């Protein structure tokens, strides 16, 4: 088991445990040493971040650790996570680092890495970095210290990359959209891009102050977006999370359109156009109704472990190009190397424009079963919850209660100190009763 890395890098409360300036300094030094092994030239690393205030502190710590190990650094500043993945590849860097805690509040932060190809690091490289952290801090001789510079054209590069993901003649003229940028990393780029494509925009969540990221806005708080869509008469709403790798939408009536819905819209249209390849990949949490709807269309569907890195792995293994999670992590591997909220939103909008459909019309063939998830806070290691006898027994009873009519999942979060409980069933009362009973047992055991 990894000592430091979770399902999406390293994440936690600022100033506690691993999310401290001294640890991040050592982490940067470890990365620099791993990248320098077996080469005569200095490795080059990109560093990007979201808008939370602690990003400045960790950016400086990473920079110092990398430079001390002899690595050059390019500072990108506030940019979406997928933009760092793209820039790492296109600028021929040896690695990319993102300072972000995604959809978490401002007092959390985290570090995630990308390979030279703009993909999440493999387990072997993560293990090498962890081993290097335990070694003494390295400062190379002065003449071999790394250099630091800022990249000035990152925004323009990423906007052109995103626009290139849709046909050249594609425009959004005549569409009124509400964009919710979560006061996060997309706050400046997303409005610029969608206006360049001709959309009439109403924007929310575009005034970051370092403390308001994800605060009542973004993909985890769709209430503001839904209300703004209804009040403004917009055609639909688009919400990103704090680092821009997730996207959710609302239709013109303000109804939530989650990642499962968006997967269906894309899979159905791409199959008809011939763009869909291989298998569509969801996760263990994907709604059963999605699996049924895709099956009706003759589209193969498999489930990976929860986490976009596992969806990516399953897509590569199955030769697929489309996958994702209900949370809004969508992978369009024929357009981007990682989950990209802006690129994914453009793919959905391109389908709607091509087919002449509204978002609600594009979803008419999907009938999801009632599903609900609750998070139960867990003071100790969340993984211990699933091993407790009373919790295991309650899980068995819950699964028996919905057998043949739904599914029950209980899993520790890979990014937060919570246990996630999900129940789906063909009857909403059965679903809620089963969820309540299981959640009560987990809370009592916490």
Swiss-Prot record:
Keyword Magnesium annotated: yes
Active site feature: 102 (phosphoserine intermediate)
One Pfam family of this chain: PGM_PMM_IV
Residues bound to Mg(2+): 102, 241, 243, 245
CDD domains, per database record: GlmM
Keywords in alphabetical order: Isomerase, Magnesium, Metal-binding, Phosphoprotein
GO function term, MF aspect, one: phosphoglucosamine mutase activity
Domain of life: Bacteria
One GO term (biological process): UDP-N-acetylglucosamine biosynthetic process
Function of the protein: Catalyzes the conversion of glucosamine-6-phosphate to glucosamine-1-phosphate.
Protein name, as recorded: Phosphoglucosamine mutase
Gene name as annotated: glmM
